[in-house]
A protein has these predicted regions:
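Short connector loops/turns at beta-strand edges and beta->alpha or beta->beta junctions
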Residues: 64-67, 103, 170-172, 260-262
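Auxiliary Fe-S-binding modules of radical SAM enzymes
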Residues: 1-58, 92-102, 126-137, 159-160, ...
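Short polybasic linear motifs
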Residues: 201, 209, 215, 219
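Canonical Radical SAM [4Fe-4S] cluster-binding loop centered on the CxxxCxxC motif
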Residues: 7-14, 50-90
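Short, glycine/serine-rich, charged loops/turns that create anion-binding
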Residues: 66, 112-115, 147, 234, ...
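Core AdoMet radical
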Residues: 74-93, 98-196, 226, 230, ...
C-alpha cells in the first residue's frame, strides 16, 4: 500500500470555472510559438485555465529547471547537467508575447539558478527593458528568487526600474526547513529589506561584489516592494502575523496571502483549507 496520504477534497469556495476553450488554446499556442515557459504550465498552477482563458500568463525565464527543490513546487529540479544555457533572445520573446496578448501588467519570474554568478539578474533586467520598449504603456512586475543574497545582483534588477519588485517569503519561519530546505527565511527577508531601502533612494548598506558599481538609481516613481506567503501548510495564525510584522518592519509595501494547493502527488500535502473568513482577518 502507498504511504502517500490521499488528497483532501477541495471546499466549495475553491472551485473554479472551466476554461474558455478558444482563448485558452490561443494563449497556449502563442507561448508555444515563441518557445516561452510559464509558471502556469511548469508549476502546474491551478489558475492556469483562468489565466490562459483571459489571455494572461506569468512568464518564467531562465529555463524550466530549478537548482532548488522546494517541496510545494512542481517545477522540475536538476543539477548543472540539466540546466539550459542563457537564451539572449528570451527577453525579446517575452516582450513580444506581452505585446501580442495586449497585457497591461506583465509579470516575469524565473526558476532559481544558483549556477549563475548573478542568479539571473541580468536576464531579468533585459526582460524588463524589452517590455518597456515594445509595450511602453504596461507596468512590469518581477518576481525574483533570492539571488543568493547578492547585493549587486539585486541592484542590477532594481536598476531596470520594474514597477513592482516581488520576492516571496512563501511560508513561516518554523516551516522553512520542511517547505524550502535550500532557502533561508532571514536571507529572503533581507532581500526585501534592501530592496525597500534602495527603492526609497537609500545607498546600499554594504559595497557590492568587486567589479563595476551597480547601485539602484533613484526613480521618479519608485518600485513597490511586494512579498507573498501560502497558508494551509500547518502554520498558525500567530506565525502568519509574525511574518506580516517582519514585512512591515522591512518596509514592504504589499503582501499577498494565498491558499496552498498541492500541484502533484510528490509535493507536500495540504494540511488544511483556510476559510474565507480567516483571510479577511489577515487583511
Amino acid at each position: 500500500m502507498s504511504d502517500v496520504p490521499p488528497r483532501r477534497r477541495k471546499p466549495a469556495w475553491l472551485k473554479v470555472k472551466a476554461p474558455a476553450p478558444r482563448q485558452y488554446r490561443a494563449t497556449g499556442a502563442l507561448l508555444d510559438e515563441l518557445e516561452l515557459h510559464t509558471v502556469c504550465r511548469e508549476a502546474r498552477c491551478p489558475n492556469k485555465g483562468e489565466c490562459y482563458s483571459s489571455g494572461t500568463a506569468t512568464f518564467l525565464i531562465l529555463g524550466d529547471t530549478c537548482t532548488r527543490g522546494c517541496r510545494f513546487c512542481a517545477v522540475e529540479t536538476g543539477g548543472a547537467a540539466g540546466l539550459c544555457a542563457l537564451d539572449s533572445d528570451e527577453p525579446r520573446r517575452v516582450a513580444e508575447a506581452a505585446r501580442r496578448l495586449a497585457l497591461r501588467h506583465v509579470v516575469i519570474t524565473s526558476v532559481t539558478r544558483d549556477d549563475l554568478p548573478d542568479g539571473g539578474a541580468a536576464q531579468f533586467a533585459a526582460a524588463v527593458a524589452a517590455v518597456r520598449e515594445r509595450l511602453p504603456g504596461a507596468t512590469v512586475e518581477v518576481l525574483i528568487p533570492d539571488l543568493g543574497g547578492d547585493d549587486a545582483a539585486l541592484a542590477a534588477v532594481l536598476a531596470a526600474r520594474p514597477d513592482v519588485l516581488n520576492h516571496n517569503l512563501e511560508t513561516v519561519v518554523r516551516l522553512y526547513a520542511e517547505v524550502r530546505p535550500q532557502a533561508q527565511y532571514h536571507r529572503s527577508l533581507q532581500v526585501l529589506r534592501r530592496a525597500a531601502a534602495w527603492a526609497r533612494g537609500a545607498a546600499p548598506a554594504r559595497p557590492p561584489a568587486p567589479g563595476p558599481a551597480r547601485p539602484a538609481p533613484p526613480t521618479p516613481a519608485r518600485p513597490l516592494v511586494k512579498s507573498g506567503l501560502m497558508v494551509g501548510l500547518g502554520e498558525t495564525a500567530d506565525e502568519v502575523a509574525a511574518v506580516l510584522a517582519d514585512c512591515a518592519a522591512a518596509a514592504v509595501d504589499l503582501v499577498t496571502i494565498g491558499q496552498y494547493l498541492q500541484p502533484e502527488r510528490g509535493c507536500l500535502p495540504v494540511a488544511r483549507y483556510v476559510a474565507p473568513e480567516e483571510f479577511r482577518e489577515y487583511e
